[in-house]
Amino acid sequence: MFSLEGGHAAATRLIRAGATGIVCASDPLALGAIRAARRAGLSVPADISVVGYDDSAFMSCTDPPLTTVRQPIEAIGRAAVAMLAGQIEGAAVSAEELFFEPEIVARGSTAAAPVKPRVLA
């Protein structure tokens, strides 16, 4: 499901429905969505915008460079280690929720929605 093929299949359905933007749950899904857009004769981002998630390695090197959401992995890891160390030392398990703010990494796969509606053959 979180593969290029899965992204291609899901995006194909969205493109046929007239979507002008697709936000994907992973970067590989987004690459599949870009492939589907191109196969439908669409330009990314002129006709449709695509956003990935995770800022995987080399996403700045794709064509177009992929706009993605970057998670604060280091901060999440530090918090997890601190919680685990506390539990190992006998601290009570906390019910506190931790929130981490992701970052949008704007690159070349997004633009304003097209002004004129498109017609697919």
Give a label for each model feature:
Residues M1-R16:
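Structural motif
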Residues L14-A121:
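Flexible loop/turn connectors
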